[in-house]
Amino acid sequence: MAVPKKRTSKSKKNLRKSQWKAQAFVQAKKALAKAKTVLKLLLNKDN
């Protein structure tokens, strides 16, 4: 017979969520830095 799983605590859920958000923030920061570099190179190439 199927038994419902125990509910994940709010603190554990928030911990995992904050971890995911922190990693996403780092990735977004890297992507933005790379985009800025590419844009600078393209602008300097024209001059």
Swiss-Prot record:
Gene Ontology CC annotations of this record: large ribosomal subunit; plastid
Main location: plastid
Gene Ontology MF annotations: structural constituent of ribosome
Taxonomic superkingdom: Eukaryota
InterPro entries in the record: Ribosomal_bL32, Ribosomal_zn-bd
Entry keyword set: Plastid, Ribonucleoprotein, Ribosomal protein
Cellular localisation: Plastid
GO biological process: translation
Statement: the UniProt record of this protein carries the keyword Chaperone: no
Cell cycle recorded as keyword: no
HAMAP family (UniProt xref): Ribosomal_bL32
Family assignment from sequence similarity: Belongs to the bacterial ribosomal protein bL32 family.
Protein name: Large ribosomal subunit protein bL32c
Organism listed in the record: Prototheca wickerhamii
Lineage, uppermost ranks: Eukaryota, Viridiplantae, Chlorophyta, core chlorophytes, Trebouxiophyceae
